[in-house]
Amino acid sequence: MSTTSEIIEKLKTLTLLEAAELVSQIEETFGVDASAPVGGGMVMAVGDAGGAAEEVAEKTTFDVVVEDIPSDKRVAVLKVIRKLTSLGLAEVKAFTNSLPGTLQEGISKEEAETAKTELEAAGAVVKIA
């Protein structure tokens, strides 16, 4: 039996809790986000009688993802999140208890950079996706 087949058979025996734990460990180990969409962003253009040329479409909308908030910086980050969004205090607390999470979606690069700068200044770990 090949290594891949052995791994698949082993995965079939995992409980839902074990599978979720495995996903978390894979995300940590390899620095990936399992919830991030795969692919996209590539556009194929047909050239003149010479074949096909690939070009990468420039991304125009961005998401601000809060990865982590140190416990000693939580209050400062909560204030910044409330300033950046229309969320109430209870919603912001719920959001920060379920990190990582997308705070803003489909915004311009400038808005995303501004939000990232403000959140990082308050102590949050942030990435732009």
From Swiss-Prot:
Signal peptide feature range: none
Keywords assigned: Chloroplast, Plastid, Ribonucleoprotein, Ribosomal protein
Principal location class: plastid
Sample GO molecular function, one term: mRNA binding
S-S bonds: none
Subcellular location: Plastid, Chloroplast
GO biological process, one term: translation
SUPFAM superfamilies (UniProt xref): ClpS-like (SSF54736), Ribosomal protein L7/12, oligomerisation (N-terminal) domain (SSF48300)
Listed GO CC annotations: chloroplast; ribonucleoprotein complex; ribosome
Function: Forms part of the ribosomal stalk which helps the ribosome interact with GTP-bound translation factors. Is thus essential for accurate translation.
HAMAP family tied to this protein: Ribosomal_bL12
Family of this protein: Belongs to the bacterial ribosomal protein bL12 family.
NCBIfam families: L12 (TIGR00855)
Subunit structure of this chain's protein: Homodimer. Part of the ribosomal stalk of the 50S ribosomal subunit. Forms a multimeric L10(L12)X complex, where L10 forms an elongated spine to which 2 to 4 L12 dimers bind in a sequential fashion. Binds GTP-bound translation factors.
Protein name according to UniProt: Large ribosomal subunit protein bL12c
Gene source species: Oltmannsiellopsis viridis (Marine flagellate)
Gene, per the UniProt record: rpl12
